Amino acid sequence: MPTDAQLSLKTRKILFASLLALICIVLVYAAFQRDRPWVVPEEVKKLKNPVVPTESTLKAASGIYMDECAQCHGERGKGDGPKARLHFPAPADLTDAHRMNLVTDGEIFYQISEGRKPMPSFKKRLTEDQRWGLVLLVRSFSTPLETPTLRKAVAVGKAQGPGTNP
């Protein structure tokens, strides 16, 4: 029969192994969550931004962004805000032109409206116009990939991307 000291050591080893296994499971789950695509209804993807980009619209959106978004996404949208390290998955880098060119305004509006852990929903906190204003602001953080040089390269078959042949 094991002594109390042996039982205690065995119990500690089992608890340590269990804790280690749990940490591994959480990390694997979180890694898969990071790359999980947003499921956005098709009709929402097709929505066009009804808000006109004016100086006052962008100024208002900038104020909302600084109050509600910059803590995680960073002042310039790089996903490097002071609270970014506390979240897993990390906040999106809104300056990533490739990523931003893959999503429609409707998708960005949906993401702001609905949220997804750890990002909160802003549907009840902000009006539709405020959320559409944020879409305009978020779009301004990245440079569109479609430039005259890219259009010309695609036209002559030198660029590869969606809709181009390899």
Regions found by a protein language model. Give the residues of each.
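Extracytoplasmic
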Residues: D67, P89-P91, E114-K117, D129
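C-terminal capping alpha-helices of c-type cytochrome domains
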Residues: I25, Y110-Q111, K123-G157
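Sequence/structural segment immediately N-terminal to covalent heme-attachment motifs in c-type
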Residues: E55-K78, A84, I108-E114, L134, ...
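His/Cys-centered metal/cofactor-coordination and adjacent catalytic loops
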Residues: L27-T57, A70-T95
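Detector for the c-type heme attachment site
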Residues: H73-G79, H98, S113, K123, ...
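N-terminal Sec-pathway targeting helices
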Residues: A5-I23
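Electrostatic cytochrome c docking/interface patches
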Residues: P37-I64, P148-T149, V156-G157, G161, ...
